[in-house]
């Protein structure tokens, strides 16, 4: 990596930096060396994150070297280097600034708005040569892995339940943190949030407290910036800012976050819910106290409940809340009910009436914390503690600064400077049911009032940060313009400022102001014109014409959701949208967060489709799509801004903000360091526009066009608010025709001169070229661990080779891409057990290669019955291996063909909306590997209609190998049938041309060997059937079976599994015998047992269901097939206890039908015959196996006629 020296510091950069990047890093180093604050703007795509990381970490390493130099000099005492001064070891650091020891080297705190942005930053860090000790802080909601805590619905309930478990040492994940947190695997690598959770799950330790441990020794700490700006969060996470370097990335949001973190709205609903909870706890505690008087032994139980509050304490809390409610209701509003505004200091008068003061706040907070922690984790009515938690937050905000000796003066003055109190009628909530106790106030019957305490100065939070002892504060973003006003708002000095140019050239960006549409109508988003038919019609025509000349993805930003929705409604009514979607389909940003990622993925997929002409994404300024998303290259070749997104002018908070700024400016005089209210109002719109413009150019080789569709952009003062890198390219057009001409010319030139963007990973599909099917032999036997893997032997479970031919069919390849993984380009044994399947690898002729649709898509009901294999194949007759061109191989004979046919079947069965949901679910599964989320999306599509059950079962072939068992169980619950029947496993039939291999991997030398001979010659029941592990027997082997008992210690993990047909038969019997209700209870208990491994719980349910009638007892015994190995012995004993001594406990067949003894087997077997008979259905001497397989072709257990292949493929199922 190139090394460059800036301000005396050597920076390791991944590549040769651009001039603007060197300038940016120089400014960062200037801030660090001079211990001053800085505001640095650098457009998106200029690599500011990489520059920040490399420059700060290089400076920190330089400082570490200086500490080493000081230690060497001190140790040498000037004898070794008498002529060398300390400064010569590090010329960028004055001698007085060198820390005394390594622990004094400043930590770096890197903050961004969201964890997803932090994940991108950590990914950038991995691309550098620096390997600092890293810590990322997150909430319990993101990091906690304790099942009980994760179930809590609200974050504050998770916090209190977690604290309670930690205090009582009842969380085993937390108990492991101290012991395991120093392990090299956890302390050394660079871990993000997802890595922490994975490592915590793997090592059984708490990721949340692990991150807090790592924080102590970390060189750089990543966190969302509300952890820094909110004093409550700083205290909760134990963040010490003294002497640290704090970096705010994406700092254009800091102003809003500072104000929101220090503000609150207290509604009547909040107060009512707080009173309800206190009422219920008070009633509960009163009953406990009465019981304790009558029965003293109850007092011990009360003491153990964990709540140290007496009923009198709870009554005081209730009185405080009622007085606060009364004080708020007593405030008189003007006749028009517009609300009343008071100075910020009024909040202390209001709270004092409720006896909430600096002196009492500590006791009140302690009582509320105890109450919430007491209720944490409790079910039913005691889960609604959000109101209590909000009251805690409110008291901490109001009394955020501790006054010396209880003197409220400083805090009152601060509140007067930065806050306003606003009280208005509650329009959003209605009062809950009227409380009818004697404490109710008459005010409860009046309309409720909302108490708002709003901070209007982001400088309030920033000054508090500086007071914590921060060494250097750096704010950076791609859109901070206008810079002067931004620094004024922060109200702290920023000596270092930078407004960087972009790294792109002039021919990569086109910016045009369009004041009029094609019909000559003025374009305006002003309040009085934005909903007029003339304006909406003209805007629709503009969008239609621009979509013709902008290739690929086009983004359209509206000022607000109502404007976007009204525009869409107008265009739909007049057929605009239908005409648009002929060229580019429309995707609309949803209001909710839930569906946003789905819409984005669908947009990306549509743009990336090979034959697609692109797509249009309609979004909102300041919305979810306006920042942090990747619209690079073809995803965003054009951005249309349809208006200036001013805040709502009549909103009380906006009016008060403007009024507050005007007051501050008037008080500071002519040269005051404050914005006017009007300037701030205009700046809010400009910042939102600049953020939207930043979506179009994302890197050095990107290009795109910006369309500003509002006549007000033609004004010079509005254009002056645009980013500095955009302003030189802006051109105002009088004629719309000239816009289309220039844009078309711009894209023609750009497409010729700019390099093609790197292609995204395409889904594998079927090619059209010729070629031959390669057949290669394995260089040697499979490793033991690999040979034990099921997907090595079963082709349908095998992950697909990345070099396979591709096609343009995106739907057909959608399922296949989930299974991709680089593997060796070799054909592997296709059978489940190599000992029984060697000769089955002989390839079929070309006539056998076409799979029926049913087999290709894994859906048995789609087409006709499966055709029979030729008789000569069944008899094991030799066949020739023919190599044919790939053009002769039907698509259905490949994984891609199966996927294509399956997708076609799904598309025919579902509506377009449902099919879109289905494809999106697959993409999410590919990226997240979350089977539960996939099932939640697929269940409503397929499970409700019995005709679609086969499609859900057919999806089994595309589920990743480690999820197949879980998906099998889900299918069983949803459809009543399993989905792993032999044809869906993709067994050896019709697998293409392969050569038969012997156990050493060489080509089979005896061409005349028949199927039966090959099987019987190599079969040894102890060594080769599942590597000698027990199958149906769950207990110890009989003493006489010495050959097999040698392997009893190496039981396969899935050896206790039953065949799906056995499970289906049992569940069908349960449904028939116990009815729907009993069946549902048993399934629920079984699912819970799988998750928590609680044997007592599941047995209690099953025993209650199956022991009411004597005839139901066999169901209890057969339930043993689901019992895990370490519970088998207890289950057998329980069956004996419940059934009586005369009833035999379920044996290895888990209560299934008894296997008939084999009259053929006369081989001597030491030990009692009774014990041997329990496993006689599976263990046979070689002679008996040979006779059964070669002559009778019957199952050795049930004597049913069958082919040898079926035996190999279904793991010897029990007879039905």
Curated annotation (Swiss-Prot):
InterPro entries: ATP-dep_Helicase_C (IPR006555), DinG/Rad3-like (IPR045028), Helic_SF1/SF2_ATP-bd_DinG/Rad3 (IPR014013), Helicase-like_DEXD_c2 (IPR006554), HHD_RTEL1 (IPR049909), P-loop_NTPase (IPR027417), RAD3-like_helicase_DEAD (IPR010614), Rad3/Chl1-like (IPR013020). One of its GO terms (biological process) is regulation of double-strand break repair via homologous recombination. Residues 978-1018, 1140-1172 are annotated as: Disordered. It holds the Pfam family Helicase_C_2. The keyword Protease does not apply. It is an enzyme of class 5 (isomerase). GO terms for molecular function: 4 iron, 4 sulfur cluster binding; ATP binding; ATP hydrolysis activity; DNA binding; DNA helicase activity; DNA polymerase binding; metal ion binding. The keyword Iron-sulfur applies. Its EC number is 5.6.2.-. A motif (DEAH box) lies at residues 249-252. One of its GO terms (cellular component) is nucleus. It comes from the Eukaryota. A motif (Nuclear localization signal) lies at residues 150-166, 874-880. It catalyses: ATP + H2O = ADP + phosphate + H(+). A motif (PIP-box) lies at residues 1172-1179. Residues 7-295 form the Helicase ATP-binding domain. Keywords: 4Fe-4S, ATP-binding, DNA damage, DNA repair, DNA-binding, Helicase, Hydrolase, Iron, Iron-sulfur, Isomerase, Metal-binding, Nucleotide-binding, Nucleus. SUPFAM superfamilies: P-loop containing nucleoside triphosphate hydrolases (SSF52540). Highly expressed in adult testis, liver and ovary. It is found in: Nucleus. Interacts with TERF1. Interacts (via PIP-box) with PCNA; the interaction is direct and essential for suppressing telomere fragility. Interacts with MMS19; the interaction mediates the association of RTEL1 with the cytosolic iron-sulfur protein assembly (CIA) complex. Belongs to the helicase family. RAD3/XPD subfamily. NCBIfam families: rad3. A probable ATP-dependent DNA helicase implicated in telomere-length regulation, DNA repair and the maintenance of genomic stability. Acts as an anti-recombinase to counteract toxic recombination and limit crossover during meiosis. Regulates meiotic recombination and crossover homeostasis by physically dissociating strand invasion events and thereby promotes noncrossover repair by meiotic synthesis dependent strand annealing (SDSA) as well as disassembly of D loop recombination intermediates. This is Regulator of telomere elongation helicase 1. It comes from Bos taurus (Bovine).
